[in-house]
A protein has these predicted regions:
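Active-site signature of alpha/beta-hydrolase-fold catalytic machinery across serine-
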Residues: 182
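Walker A/P-loop nucleotide-binding motif
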Residues: 160-179
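Alpha-helical lid/collar subdomain of P-loop NTPases
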Residues: 1-163
Length: 184
């Protein structure tokens, strides 16, 4: 349960202010309240659902989370969070000093929602190209389909948390190391 709250604390607080113009939240989310509920749902999925191996168990847990949202927050917020919203900490461009042109912060970390998966895919493709340019030995040549993108986002979330860790299990050659390199 503490991991859910740790994930909630990672989020950028400015996104929760009412009466302020916000950039798009992603999915069907239209309000700061919906954004908080979407973040809570996302963190519950990362903490509880990602550990399950059976699709039946995952579906049951998903429906339970959705039922809790409906019972607790009402129909309006339930509709806002029906569509999944993905949260990542690598969407922001590097911070550059206007006067000198120096890079002040190469990878600013703000845990926030992505508007859609295409935006994350485009950014991951550009990060992969930058990695390939800078690495002399290891090259990444990944096809980033939806499952690969969501796995990469999960790994990036774990790496951004204090004492975050993961045990990556899978068949050799399935992309565990490559996705971790990209997420880092």
């Amino acid at each position: 349960l503490s991991k859910v709250f740790q994930g909630l604390i990672l989020a950028e607080r400015d996104r929760f202010k009412s009466g302020v113009q916000h950039p798009p939240f992603g999915g069907n989310v239209k309000s700061p309240e919906g954004y908080l509920v979407a973040l809570w749902r996302h963190e519950c999925e990362r903490v509880f659902v990602d550990k399950l191996t059976s699709y039946d168990d995952k579906d049951w847990t998903d429906s339970l989370i959705q039922k809790i949202i409906g019972d607790t927050f009402g129909e309006k917020l339930t509709k806002e969070v029906e569509e999944r919203v993905y949260f990542v900490d690598f969407l922001r461009p590097p911070v550059i000093d206007d006067q000198t042109g120096d890079v002040l912060e190469a990878n600013p970390s703000f845990y926030e929602s992505s508007v859609d998966l295409q935006m994350v895919k485009d950014l991951a493709d550009s990060k992969m190209a930058a990695f390939n340019e800078s690495s002399k030995t290891v090259k990444l040549d990944l096809v980033l389909f939806t499952d690969a993108l969501t796995h990469m986002m999960r790994i990036a979330r774990l790496l951004s948390m204090d004492r975050g860790s993961a045990l990556l299990v899978g068949v050799g050659g399935s992309g565990k190391q490559s996705l971790t390199r990209l997420a880092a």
